[in-house]
Amino acid sequence: MSAANWCENAVFYEVLVRTFQDSNGDGVGDFEGLESRLDYLQWLGVDCLWLPPFFASPLDDGGYDVADFLSTHPDFGSVEQLSHLLDAAHSRGMRVIADLPLNHTSIAHQWWREELEALRAIDAGTLDAADFTPRYVWSTTGEEYADARVIFEDTETSNWTFEPSVGRFYWHRFFSHQPDLNYDNPAVQEDMLDVLRFWLSKGLDGFRLDAVPYLYERHGTNGENLPETHAYLARVRAMVDEEFPGCVLIAEANQWPRDVVDYFGSEEAPECHMCFHFPLMPRIFLSFARGEASSIDRILADTPQLPAGAVWGTFLRNHDELTLEMVDDVERADLYARYAPEPRMRANVGIRRRLLPLLGSAEAVECAVAMLLSMPGAPFLYYGDEIGMADDIWLVDRDGVRTPMQWDGSTNAGFSPQSSYPPVLSTMPNVQAALADPTSLLYAHRRLIAQRKAVFDASDDWCIVASDEVFAFERAGVLCAFNVTAEPQSVTVAGIEVYLPGHGYAWVPLVDRVLPHLVGQRFYGGSADSSGVQIVRAESWQFGGVWLTVESAGAFYRTLVDATGRDLLAQYAAEGDDAAGAGVGVDVVGYVRGLLAERGHTLVGDVQAQRVGGEQSNTSFVVGSWVVKFQRRLAEGVNPEVLVADALADCPHAAHVVAHDEGACVATVVPLVDGARDGWELALERGLVGDDSGEGVDVAGLGAAIACVHAALDEGHVQRRENLLDCLRERMVRTGTQAGLGDALSSGLIEVLSNTGAGSDQVPVQRVHGDLHLGQVLWDSSRWVLIDFEGEPAATPAERAAEHSPMKDLAGMIRSFDYATQVRARENAASSSTAADAGAGAVEQATQVLLDGYRQAGGTVDEALLQAYLLDKALYEYDYELHHRPDFRYIPARALKALGIATPE
């Protein structure tokens, strides 16, 4: 194992051996049971297990009442079984630390029994008091150290308890059955060092040192943080560093950060590698209770700078009560009122409840966990909180938050049917059910942990930028924002408008993280230089991830991201059904189900989301009997596809929009053409017209389908031919100039456009498909269906909604014929040297069949205008291929040459 700095980035997970998993049918968790669940913990992303005391104990205080530091509790297993557990964890890349109660023992400890015997011997005169150094702290009056507070004030009235068998009072900072050790006795110091040596030599990776501020007592002090305590901890650290390098020490000191920081020690005398930040935890809950985050900001502002290599341990819940010692009376009253209105919900100066019952919703839990995982420090999670386990306020002390882990829906939740204590809860969220639901809190934990590891580092600086209803900070190129209220909130941070639902959060990757994943996406046409890119909006999406609106050169793009900056829809499409398990966590199915329900439609059955193949400027998925399309480029105005939905509702050859969303996610849903294949795929497989290499496709039927769609969209509008040609000319000049065609374009345009003036002065115009090609038509074995009426992706909504001659769609399809035949010819070139020429002949033949089918279905073909639109489309293709796919430039170049426009070789 490596040096002890491994803890700086680790995710810790507290697991009670007694209640995690039993292996031998006795209903009590044990080492072998825990070992059997290591794969689950590895899957979750846990780096280090934290085990509360597993030593021999009467278990009057959950094992913190130790009866023998050098043996294990027999119910949990043997020392050898523990060693096997440690080896199994290490083989999975996980470490294991344990609690060590340095301060006290149980009255069942042999040391205590020997102490009482010695004191009785002194009183009897059989032992010289000068030969006796007590292991515990005694008084004849019980009046010493009066300035030390009583910690468990609801069960203990004093830190002294009278022991009648010896006629003396003994000192205990905790329960009266846990007498404090006397660290002024050198033998106690050595014995406890030997305890550490024993377990570290067995393979433990460190200790959480329980209750370290109270090791020594001095008159006139509060008995906390004494110089002698720090001196002893420095001695412990020196031994660990020398004899067990790579092992860690963690201080449990429930005090203000300015006091706790001393437990890190100094450069000359280091003490603990980590310390818990106790005051932060209740202030996170206070922020959710009050709906304002300033209390978090204030405690962080009061937190001193850490020494190099030192790490705060942060947490939300653990095996103890949610301690409220480090808040004032007003804050404590607010916390009790919000989270523990019933007295049974309280313990000591705190609240004995689990995370989900405290915060009240999975959304609030996920928000709080995301906050914990993105803050500096090493986060500690508590077993069962990842599945939303409840608590039992009717159990004694803190046992209500220590109930058995719930693995499945069986009677005993995966434990053997023997009775267990604490008993299994009647409410049954469980791991098995959570694993079957990619939207579960469990999967959310896994995704958050994975993103934390991919993005954040212990050395990252951070800057708090908002602390009202939204707590926000910037760290490691990620803007982290958390809405601590139940109402939607927005805040502008670093120029980004951040929108969050109630108790929502967003990890917003900044430009340098997002841009590498954007460049190369089909929908992105912006700059590859971060100086030319700006994130203007971020919106947390309830179905997973954060929608970013990215601006570059006046264009706006949409990408759904996590903290790494990767595009989650692209990742989802790449990983398919395993996307949620791989950490993507986008619920496309749930989104479509809800969107359809709002419009009175139903998504039937247990369905998956499958990516629609082919290159698209948007991202589409088949979900059951529907297709959802996520818009990736934004512009002002109504989506053109929505505008024609009503007109196409009764057309059998059009997949029209039945539901759309203009909120955080801009998307449309259309019916799926069941069992259909797109025209591009068919053309490559069969050829356009029947020949020796393929049976061909129904091109005539395609022409008829296009005519049917045009008839549905026709509103009887006309435009002067001259005006239409002027618009086409202007567009073609602009496109050709971008492509560097220059004078060749000018002369070619004159020749082509001179032939378009013949015919009626009034030209029919209407809303058309606008981006028609073989990839936009589906064949279901009996009919063609046109899809995606959005128009040209690069155009504005106004341009896409503009009326054109129907010849625009026919020209687009004919140009697609050319591409399909050329690509097919290219694939068959090895076996046929004349394939390209044969392909050209196939295009001419298919074009004629298409136009005949169009006419027979009632469409009118304006041959002159068709030529103009063919030139316009070929110029657009040439410019696109020149800048994006140079290897395909030859296809539109051949078409331009046939139209009289020469292109560079």
Put a short name on every predicted segment.
Residues 512-539:
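Short Lys/Arg-enriched alpha/beta "domain-start" segment
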Residues 767-770, 774:
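Catalytic-loop of the protein kinase fold
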Residues 788-792:
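Activation of the activation-loop gatekeeper triad in protein kinase-fold domains
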Residues 543-733, 782-783, 794-829, 836:
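Conserved ATP-binding subdomain of kinase catalytic cores across diverse folds
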Residues 1-511:
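Active-site and adjacent substrate-binding regions of carbohydrate-active enzymes
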Residues 776-786:
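Conserved protein kinase catalytic/activation segment
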Residues 830-864, 868-905:
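ATP/Mg2+ or Mg2+-diphosphate-binding catalytic cores
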Residues 600-607, 733-767:
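An alpha-helical support segment within catalytic cores of ATP-dependent transferases
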